[in-house]
């Protein structure tokens, strides 16, 4: 797996490999029409569950809250639950290691800012806390698992979690060695170009960047006030609120992978447990961070309930409707929006989704939003590439300023031109 010119991973191999059909590959790729879908995998993984909804899939219980013990909450972007569950599985002797994403110590020599690594103790687990909106791939760590016997948990996005379960069905070694998956809620995957955009807008050369933090945490500010921070090789720190970035609205879809347009899983439906942010009040205003948790496996649910009883976790049980509300925008994009996108003419392989193609489900206003989001995601890659090639950052930032101003006008102000102009002027300040 290597980066393409847009900072997204693509498989690379001999020319004859591309031309030779592979049944096992077709059944393992999470976006392949030949692969099992999330409903089929979830039923196989969790044949008996207490609850099920169309949007959340199968589950035992849902919770909202945070970790009380130690520094889990402070170290993470949200409530600390992802690292806590991984650590608890390790503490109980149920796993020997955790596949998670960490920052690379020397990104300039490596060519990446983040990668998957196997954590085998608490200190290494803590290094994987926080959100990383950066493309990663699993081939390196999966090779290690194949070579080194043990029991492992994987922390992954919905599509990668699905891929792990498809791989487990194909290969008995991975079925034995990966007994747990810890899924993350997902809006979409960003390309590596997002970091380049940060650097341009903060007026620092990308080659001088040592660390990237997408959500710099400040307990005195609302959790949904994202702040991007870059730490430079000389120790200098530059940061800016996402609201003041020309591509800082997540919903606009800047640098989104094209595959994300055809994904219908927001909440990691195939994972043993899944985690997201509680994007509803009063939780979204709590800068300390709050998790929403979906426990699908009975074992993990029991583990969580025991920790609540021991006052190690401050979690409140909630119903499915509450969880769905916290991710309402993501579900619109992956249900109503996907139904509309599936009606568009498309060359090549046609994705097979659980959502039925429907051009009448969305209103005209929503259709314009979905169209705009699609084209912003498509052209953001191209305009950033052109800006780099010409060594003219303004090619990208000027285009992005106009694109986001238009998006804000149609998404939040019913197409009001004066509001578009107002937002455009704000970005220029």
Predicted regions and their residues:
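Portal/gating segments that form or line small-molecule/metal binding sites
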Residues: 76, 81-90, 94-146
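Non-heme iron-sulfur electron-transfer modules
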Residues: 1-66, 280-283
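Immediate flanking context of iron-sulfur cluster ligation sites
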Residues: 9-11, 15-24, 149-152, 176, ...
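Short, conserved secondary-structure transition motifs
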Residues: 185-197, 216-221
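Long, compositionally biased charged/polar accessory segments in the mid-to-C-terminal portions
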Residues: 95-96, 207-429
């Amino acid at each position: 797996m290597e980066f393409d010119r847009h900072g997204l991973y693509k498989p690379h191999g001999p020319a004859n490999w591309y031309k030779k059909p592979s049944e096992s590959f077709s059944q393992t790729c999470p976006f392949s029409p030949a692969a099992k879908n999330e409903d089929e995998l979830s039923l196989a993984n969790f044949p008996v569950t207490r609850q099920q909804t169309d949007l959340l899939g199968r589950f035992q219980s849902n919770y909202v809250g945070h970790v009380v013990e130690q520094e889990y909450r402070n170290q993470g972007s949200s409530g600390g639950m992802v690292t806590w569950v991984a650590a608890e599985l390790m503490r109980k002797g149920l796993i020997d290691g955790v596949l998670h994403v960490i920052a690379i110590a020397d990104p300039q020599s490596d060519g990446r800012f983040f990668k998957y690594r196997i954590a085998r103790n608490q200190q290494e687990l803590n290094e994987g806390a926080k959100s990383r909106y950066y493309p990663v791939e699993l081939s390196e760590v999966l090779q290690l698992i194949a070579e080194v016997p043990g029991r492992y948990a994987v922390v992954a996005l919905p599509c990668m979690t699905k891929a792990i379960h498809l791989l487990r069905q194909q290969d008995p070694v991975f079925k034995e060695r990966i007994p747990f998956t810890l899924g993350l809620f997902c809006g979409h995957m960003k390309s590596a170009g997002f970091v380049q955009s940060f650097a341009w807008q903060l007026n620092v050369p990308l080659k001088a960047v040592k660390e990237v933090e997408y959500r710099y945490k400040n307990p005195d500010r609302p959790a949904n006030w994202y702040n991007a921070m870059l730490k430079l090789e000389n120790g200098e720190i530059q940061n800016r609120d996402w609201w003041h970035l020309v591509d800082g609205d997540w919903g606009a879809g800047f640098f989104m992978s094209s595959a994300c347009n055809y994904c219908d899983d927001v909440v990691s439906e195939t994972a043993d447990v899944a985690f997201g942010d509680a994007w509803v009040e009063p939780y979204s205003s709590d800068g300390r961070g709050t998790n929403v948790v979906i426990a699908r496996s009975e074992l993990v649910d029991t583990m969580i309930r025991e920790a609540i009883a021991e006052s190690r976790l401050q979690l409140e049980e909630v119903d499915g409707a509450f969880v769905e509300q916290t991710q309402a925008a993501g579900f619109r994009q992956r249900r109503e929006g996907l139904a509309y996108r599936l009606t568009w003419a498309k060359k090549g392989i046609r994705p097979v989704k659980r959502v039925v193609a429907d051009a009448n489900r969305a209103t005209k206003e929503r259709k314009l939003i979905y169209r705009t989001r699609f084209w912003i995601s498509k052209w953001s890659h191209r305009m950033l590439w052109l800006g780099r090639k010409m060594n003219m950052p303004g090619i990208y930032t000027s285009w992005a300023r106009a694109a986001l101003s238009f998006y804000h006008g149609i998404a939040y102000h019913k197409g009001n031109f004066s509001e578009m102009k107002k937002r455009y002027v704000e970005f220029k300040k």
